[in-house]
Amino acid sequence: MCQYNKMFSHVYVEKGVTEHSRTKQILEKLNNTTVIEIDHYKDVFCRKKQSISAQSNAKALILAENTSGCIYEGAPVCQSFGNENFYYCSCMMNCIFDCEYCYLKGMYPSGNLVVFVNLEDIFAELEALLAQKSIYLCVSYDADLVAIELLTGFVREWIAFTKKHENLTIEIRTKSGRCDLWSNYEACDRVIIAYTVSPQRVAAEYEHFASAPMERIQAAKCAMDSGFPVRLCFDPMIYCKDWRGEYSRMVGDVFSQIDGSKLWDVSIGSFRISQDYLKKMRKDMPCSAVVNFPYDNVNGYYQYPENIRSDMEEFMIQAVSEYVDKDRIFMWK
């Protein structure tokens, strides 16, 4: 039987950030860890012939400095929620969870996690943009900041930064079930906490290491009760056996705990992914049902065949609209 190291048993640290305060803070929180100095994070992260599926069982941590910028315009497959100046930020690369369908598996060459400790430079880059226009920024697309908050403290820092900049609204998206954070952080109406919620069957089969759906629902309620605007993301919807029953039960579970009228909004969308990402994922995960489904290729993006996609999305809109006004339900198009 294969024996894996524990998560973050090995930490690679760029020589240029060994004395950075955040590097020291992170290393102080890790026990029984082997620390290895490197010249550049890409020496480890971008090595050829890495197996992301194998690394998911024993992720290494890489502490690095971002020197090329972290703020990007939003991608076509992502929802802007009607916001004009839509950007996302990569202050981390990769996620401690292991969702089989996640596009990160196709985008990155490694399953290891990179944390850019020079958050102050990312804030400076963002301030230059904010001097020109208002910004809607997703800060947790390429990682789950909430899930690793005890180690990095980035969520706290993003909230504090946003409170100081009135023309900035951020979204922090997560599959973490942590409830303890929100009561300890001062709420801001421009910090949207977004929870991705899936049916129990989908979570059990494909969302490895992520918090259980009911734990995410409880955490979303905690965030709402603490004064944060909360977004629920039923996205991506995953086609599975008895999908109608699975998603119907999930909606019932959600709105038995959460008052839909108090939600900031809701996101609905079926699974879609870049053709290049899926090609790479299929090579790495030949036995994954969700990765190897016979999707349709529409203009370079794989998605469910039209009959499946429209049935799932229309079903979900109808189910959610019993609890949430339709003008607060957003669809990916």
Label the predicted regions.
Residues 143-146, 177-180, 191-211, 236-240, ...:
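Conserved radical SAM core fold
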Residues 1-85:
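Flexible, acidic/Gly-rich N-terminal and inter-domain linker regions that tether
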Residues 152, 193-196, 243-259, 285-292:
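Short, electropositive alpha-helical surface patch
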Residues 216-276, 324, 330-331:
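Conserved C-terminal portion of the radical SAM core fold
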Residues 62-85, 100-194:
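Conserved Radical SAM active-site core
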Residues 125-131, 181-183, 213-226, 316:
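Structured alpha-helical segments in the cores of large, soluble enzyme domains
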Residues 1-24, 255-333:
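Auxiliary Fe-S-binding modules of radical SAM enzymes
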Residues 89-99:
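Cysteine-centered iron-sulfur cluster-binding motifs in ferredoxin-type domains/subunits
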